[in-house]
C-alpha cells in the first residue's frame, strides 16, 4: 500500500503474533498467516486495517516506514516492533510487548511484559501481571503493575509508578518529579550530581538510605527534583549517579 506523510496501521487479532519491521519510505506491506476466512486487510486513507470478525489465530507481519503509528488490539498475541514508530498503542488480555523506540506509548494488559529501548514523549503502561522495562523516557510517564518490577534506565519527565508486589528502579532521574508506591517491593533511584532533592518518603517496615550531603564546598545545584515515595514493607535507596 502506498501511503502519505501520516500513515497508521491498526491490527485486531484474537491470538497469534504481530511483528513490525522496517520497510521502504511511503510503502506499507502486510503479510498475514491465518485460517480465519473473515480476516482481511483494507485501507481507509492513510490508515491500513487488518482484522477478522470471528477471532482465531493470525500471524501478522508489517513492513512499514519509520515513525508510523501502530495500534494493536488482541486477546493473547505477542507484539514485537523492530523499527522506530510514532505512536504505539497495544491493548491485550495476555501477551508481551517488545519495541525499539516510540514517539508515544500506551499499553494495557492483564498479563504481559512490556520492554522497550525508549519513548521520546509520554508513556502510559498498565499491566496486572508483568514487568515494565524501558530504557529512556523523554516526557511524562504513568506506569502501573500489580505483580511485576518496573525498571527505567533514565526518565527526563514527571514519573508516576505503582507496584503492589514488585520493585521499582530508576537508574537516572532527571525529570522534575517522581511519585512511587509499592506494598511489598523496594524503590531504588539514581539522581545526577548537583541535584537538590525534595524528599517526602515513608515506609512501615523498611529502611531509607540516602546519599551523603554534598557539603558546603560543593558546586551549586543545577536542578531540583521532588520525590514522593510510599512503601509498606520495602526499602528506599537513593544514590547519586553520573
Locate predicted features.
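Intrinsically disordered, low-complexity terminal regions
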Residues: 1-242
Amino acid at each position: 500500500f502506498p501511503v502519505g506523510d501520516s500513515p497508521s496501521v491498526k491490527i485486531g487479532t484474537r491470538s497469534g503474533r504481530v511483528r513490525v519491521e522496517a520497510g521502504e519510505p511511503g510503502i506499507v506491506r502486510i503479510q498475514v498467516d491465518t485460517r480465519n476466512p473473515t480476516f482481511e486487510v483494507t485501507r481507509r486513507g492513510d490508515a491500513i486495517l487488518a482484522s477478522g470478525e470471528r477471532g482465531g489465530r493470525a500471524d501478522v507481519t508489517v513492513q512499514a516506514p519509520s515513525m508510523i503509528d501502530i495500534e494493536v488490539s488482541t486477546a493473547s498475541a505477542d507484539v514485537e516492533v523492530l523499527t522506530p514508530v510514532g505512536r504505539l498503542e497495544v491493548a491485550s488480555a495476555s501477551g508481551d510487548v517488545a519495541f525499539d523506540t516510540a514517539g508515544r506509548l500506551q499499553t494495557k494488559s492483564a498479563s504481559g511484559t512490556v520492554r522497550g529501548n525508549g519513548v521520546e514523549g509520554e508513556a502510559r503502561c498498565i499491566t496486572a501481571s508483568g514487568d515494565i522495562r524501558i530504557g529512556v523516557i523523554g516526557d511524562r510517564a504513568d506506569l502501573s503493575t500489580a505483580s511485576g518490577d518496573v525498571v527505567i534506565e533514565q526518565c527526563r519527565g514527571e514519573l508516576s509508578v505503582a507496584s503492589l508486589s514488585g520493585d521499582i528502579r530508576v537508574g537516572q532521574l532527571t525529570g522534575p518529579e517522581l511519585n512511587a508506591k509499592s506494598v511489598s517491593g523496594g524503590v531504588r533511584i539514581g539522581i545526577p550530581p548537583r541535584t537538590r532533592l525534595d524528599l517526602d518518603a515513608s515506609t512501615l517496615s523498611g529502611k531509607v538510605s540516602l546519599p551523603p550531603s554534598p557539603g558546603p564546598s560543593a558546586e551549586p545545584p543545577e536542578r531540583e527534583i521532588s520525590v514522593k515515595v510510599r512503601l509498606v514493607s520495602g526499602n528506599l535507596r537513593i544514590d547519586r549517579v553520573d
